Amino acid sequence: MGPGGTCPWSSRLSGFRVRTWIEPVVASTQVAGSLYDAGLLLVVKESFKSEAGGSSNYSANQSLVEYQEDQQQKAISNFNIIYNLVLGLTPLLSAYGLGWLSDRYHRKISICTAMLGFLLSRIGLLLKVMLDWPVEVMYGAAALNGLCGSFSAYWSGVMALGSLGCSEGRRSVRLILIDLVLGLAGFSGSMASGHLFKQIVGHSAQGLLLTACSVGCAAFALFYSLFVLKVPESKPNKVHPTVDTVSGMMGTYRTLDPDQQDKQNVPRNPRTPGKGKSSQREVVALLFVGAIIYDLAAVGTVDVMALFVLKEPLHWNQVQLGYGMASGYIIFITSFLGVLVFSRCFRDTTMIIIGMLSFGSGALLLAFVKETYMFYIARAIMLFALIPITTIRSAMSKLIKDSSYGKIFVILQLCLTLTGVVTSTIYNKIYQLTLDKFIGTCFVLSSFLSFLAIVPIGVVAYKQVPRSQQGECAEKQRS
């Protein structure tokens, strides 16, 4: 294989080729992000600790500690509602424009701008800890992060750079490697976060070391992308007339066209153009519905889970919280490893359903968790929970024209973003209302939504069956 068909790491490691690797940026950014997520939750928890003090009129029949804990949980939940609204809506103003500028002028624009927002938000948390600012200052930090594009602009830029300089045959390996780096970096940062969140001798602020490390990693990522990272030259793709594959975040997937038959074994019959386009539009619409319903379940569970583990019966400390967040990154790794295995023998729809069943079953068990080991069993059942959204996005790319990629994916991303904002608000309110009754209500709801999302995907799977097989099944049922 000549140099034109290889990825940067498979040929001679020249200085320029090493500088085209996006992995150092992904790793440092994700470590900073995992430290920030844990630090923000713990700092907010400590900030509301004093405000959740008991009342002199409060009944002595109930424990004062439980009352303070409930008030603290509600305060954190209300903070999360506003914070997620700001962080979720502000990128809508800039993410699309940054993507357009990156395509037109320079590929690093969206990455560098988004990482500037990451750095500013991390600095905001550091200043809040050092100067004991009110916790509301983090709303401004979230707004700055969002106006710089946030994760939407950043990850689209990472995927673009990861795909450049690599032939289509090796592109899936490159993108999987980026996913692996992301998962391992997040796991490492989360594992360390609880240990870093402690008082420094001579300083009363908790979380100073944790937030300082987050700022340092974010600053390294920004300066590396500005002064070291180079945009690789694009490699020409080889045309494979009998193979219809598209690279996604988790590898290369097979076609999902319901009207496409085996090109090698089945002779092509003329089809009515309008019928084929109509069928594809129906499949894309069903995939949209499945993605949105599943995203409702996933986003709601993640938002509530952080509060759930801080309250009885688990009542985790800082170190345990870091370990619990790290388990989420293990799920990220197992999900794309699952895609690597499943894509060899299953259709896209089958992989999506496997992921939805995995998440729904784990969420249902999570609702009845009483001990820490039960929490990790539930998370282990969710090991394929990240497969559905990525596979849906990859499957949709096979059903639309290249010229429509941007429009369709922007619409999908906007739908998922708005869904996440609405879901966060609704789930946090439900959590507050059911805090004293059944704390696992949100997880039961997520499980139901996850199983409900299988319905539109099942319809897509039915449409995927060749017409000849559907006719044979109908004849067998008549006989």
Swiss-Prot record:
Compartment list: Endosome membrane; Cell membrane
Activity regulation behaviour: Down-regulated by the anti-inflammatory drug methotrexate.
InterPro entries, per database record: MFS, MFS_trans_sf, Tet-R_TetA/multi-R_MdtG-like
Membrane side Extracellular: residue ranges: 45-80, 132-140, 196-207, 303-321, 370-371, 429-441
Expression (tissue specificity): Expressed on cortical epithelial cells in the thymus. Mainly expressed in the thymic cortex and is highly enriched in SCID thymus. Also expressed in lymph nodes, heart, fetal liver, brain, spleen, intestine and kidney, but not in adult liver, skin, skeletal muscle and lung. Expressed in skin epidermis.
Bilayer topology annotation: Multi-pass membrane protein
Gene Ontology terms describing biological process: cyclic-GMP-AMP transmembrane import across plasma membrane; negative regulation of T cell apoptotic process; positive regulation of nucleotide-binding oligomerization domain containing 1 signaling pathway; regulation of T cell differentiation; T cell homeostasis; thymus development
Keywords of the record: Cell membrane, Endosome, Glycoprotein, Membrane, Transmembrane, Transmembrane helix, Transport
Membrane spanning residue stretches: 24-44, 81-101, 111-131, 141-161, 175-195, 208-228, 282-302, 322-342, 349-369, 372-392, 408-428, 442-462
Gene ablation phenotype (knockout): Mutant mice are resistant to psoriatic inflammation.
Keyword Mitochondrion assigned: no
GO cellular component: cell surface; endosome membrane; plasma membrane
GO molecular function annotations of the record: cyclic-GMP-AMP transmembrane transporter activity
Region (Disordered): 255-277
Catalytic activity of the protein: N-acetyl-beta-D-glucosaminyl-(1->4)-1,6-anhydro-N-acetyl-beta-D-muramoyl-L-alanyl-gamma-D-glutamyl-meso-2,6-diaminopimeloyl-D-alanine(out) + n H(+)(out) = N-acetyl-beta-D-glucosaminyl-(1->4)-1,6-anhydro-N-acetyl-beta-D-muramoyl-L-alanyl-gamma-D-glutamyl-meso-2,6-diaminopimeloyl-D-alanine(in) + n H(+)(in); L-alanyl-gamma-D-glutamyl-meso-2,6-diaminopimelate(out) + n H(+)(out) = L-alanyl-gamma-D-glutamyl-meso-2,6-diaminopimelate(in) + n H(+)(in); N-acetyl-D-muramoyl-L-alanyl-D-isoglutamine(out) + n H(+)(out) = N-acetyl-D-muramoyl-L-alanyl-D-isoglutamine(in) + n H(+)(in); 2',3'-cGAMP(out) + n H(+)(out) = 2',3'-cGAMP(in) + n H(+)(in)
Modifications the protein undergoes after translation, according to the UniProt entry: Glycosylated.
This protein's record includes keyword Membrane: yes
Glycosylation sites per record: 57, 61
Cross-referenced SUPFAM superfamilies: MFS general substrate transporter
A Pfam entry, by short name: MFS_1
Membrane side Cytoplasmic: residue ranges: 1-23, 102-110, 162-174, 229-281, 343-348, 393-407, 463-479
Function: Proton-coupled transporter that delivers pathogen-associated or danger-associated molecular patterns to cytosolic pattern recognition receptors as part of the innate immune response to microbes or tissue injury. Has selectivity toward muropeptides that contain the amino acid diaminopimelic acid (DAP-type peptidoglycan muropeptides) including Tri-DAP and tracheal toxin (TCT), common in Gram-negative bacteria and Gram-positive bacilli.
Family: Belongs to the major facilitator superfamily. SLC46A family.
Protein name: Solute carrier family 46 member 2
Species name: Mus musculus (Mouse)
Name of the gene encoding the protein in the UniProt record: Slc46a2
